[in-house]
Amino acid sequence: SVVEAMQITLFVGELPSQYHQEYGSSYIVHGLPLVNPDTSITLVRKTPQGMKFWLAKHDEEKIFSGLDKMMGDIVKRCDGRKPLAVFHADCAFRGKISFNKILKEELVGHMQYPLCKDEGIPWLGMYSGGEYAMLGGRHFFHIFTTSLNVILRRES
């Protein structure tokens, strides 16, 4: 039914242009629609009236290429310093429900190896229902994403 299809479809909206390059996309996920009894929908992210949306689905190639870009940026910002710890928040639906165990372990490995190599760096991971990550120099609410916060010693 239309209602069932809406419950597994991602809605994306256009991201403000100043974030396109840093984010690696001109669109940002607004989430799965919550279908109300009257068949109207509710989205998690606050959206301005009249905003246009597109329907989207997972694109594994884009997920991995985006992850590689994110890890390259993080490693560059570490500037050779070894992380003291990493806090990792992952979307519960995207990471725990949508992906199979093998793919999820591959994604986590793609994140851990560039930062930790084979060293015993503490890595605290959790699933969430919305993730905060930096975008444009400020905390930004994301949905269906991964957020990594790397703790480093200050440069002397």
Where are these predicted regions, by residue range?
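Small-residue-enriched flexible segments
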Residues: 1-121, 126-156
